[in-house]
Amino acid sequence: VYALVKETARRFSLGNIEVKATSNDLYLAEKYDFVEILGETAIYKNHWDVMGVPYSWNMVHYDEQLLGGILLHYGYATEMATGEGKTLVATLPVFLNALSHEGVHVITVNDYLSKRDFETTRPLYMFYGLSADCIEYYNRYDRRRKETYKSDIFFGMHSSFTFDYLYDHIAIKPEECVQQKHNYAIIDELD
């Protein structure tokens, strides 16, 4: 699976990826700027906006990053310095564990990083039909926040996940709960 993600990242770094359009591609093209439909072809662009700024994908996993992804998948803490590619490394175990459709929490220290990492990596996940969203776009009482938790992958900051968990445990009615699944989590800045 990691080789598949690495190859997709490599293809994105070289340019747009063209595939036969599926219903999922049509849906994504209506919602996001990184997919375009031309006839029966879906074009996944290697450039899109991240936090309102134009961004071009230019990252490919190094062997050391693949090893980091394996360690994270098996539950080990992995220390990486600034600039060593934590966001890229996290794509590997996130992708692998999202294949079960049981939910993957990507937990960051602030809403900026949650949104940035989501917007940077979502084409990589969505190219394979995985759903992804970020809870930081919606407040606790917005129905879209509950829908976000139904995604295969959801990004958010640690305090948001914590408070959603606590509120769910004091909810009077089941429909007031927003969290759905607790399967796998990646925590950025564990310290």
Language-model regions, residue ranges each:
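Conserved P-loop NTPase motor core
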Residues: 1-191
